[in-house]
């Protein structure tokens, strides 16, 4: 398995992974209608042009996992930038492999480099139900908050 930064040639496969993620998670956002693939396309290009990080896991020329993260201004300190993970997804048949761990390791290395270069101050990951087996504390993260969802 290869873990690498995603590029413009991965677009179609990345879109497929985002669709699979969207279908797999229990998001209340599904009430909004179909996934806006044009927006996903624009967001992906924005990320790979420097607004974040896109990492993929590839096996036998197929993308089997993805991490997308986007730089945002800190809500309290607008001159500080935070890298927020948007999604972490591994295809179900590859979840008992090292794909997720290896992508997270690469995410940390790239994000740590961004911290060292003063591009960002901190970076985040979100522990969704599909990632409940990962011990983020052992990877150096500390719990900051929990997210609860209500409404449509």
Q: Where are the language model's segments positioned?
A:
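A short beta-loop-alpha structural element at the N-terminal edge
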Residues: 2-16
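Conserved GNAT-fold acetyl-CoA-binding loop/helix
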Residues: 22-42
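A short helix-loop-beta-strand connector motif used in the catalytic cores of GNAT acetyltransferases and
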Residues: 42-56
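Conserved beta-strand in the GNAT
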Residues: 56, 62-71
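Conserved acetyl-CoA binding element of GNAT-fold acetyltransferases
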Residues: 79-92
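Conserved acetyl-CoA-binding loop-helix of GNAT-fold acetyltransferases
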Residues: 90, 96-110
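Conserved beta-strand-loop-alpha-helix junction that forms the acyl-donor binding cleft
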Residues: 107, 117, 121-133, 151
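Conserved acetyl-CoA-binding loop of GNAT-fold acetyltransferases
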Residues: 135-146
């Amino acid at each position: 398995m290869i873990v690498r930064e995603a590029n413009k040639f991965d677009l179609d496969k990345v879109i497929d992974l985002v669709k699979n993620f969207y279908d797999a998670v229990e998001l209340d956002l599904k009430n909004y209608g179909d996934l806006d693939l044009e927006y996903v396309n624009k967001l992906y290009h924005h990320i790979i042009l420097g607004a974040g990080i896109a990492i993929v896991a590839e096996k036998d020329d197929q993308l089997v996992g993805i991490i997308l993260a986007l730089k945002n201004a800190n809500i309290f300190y607008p001159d500080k930038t935070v890298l927020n993970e948007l999604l972490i997804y591994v295809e179900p048949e590859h979840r008992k492999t090292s794909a997720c761990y290896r992508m997270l390791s690469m995410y940390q290395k790239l994000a740590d480099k961004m911290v060292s270069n003063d591009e960002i101050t901190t970076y985040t990951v979100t522990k969704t139900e599909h990632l409940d087996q990962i011990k983020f504390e052992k990877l150096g993260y500390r719990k900051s908050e929990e997210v609860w969802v209500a409404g449509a």
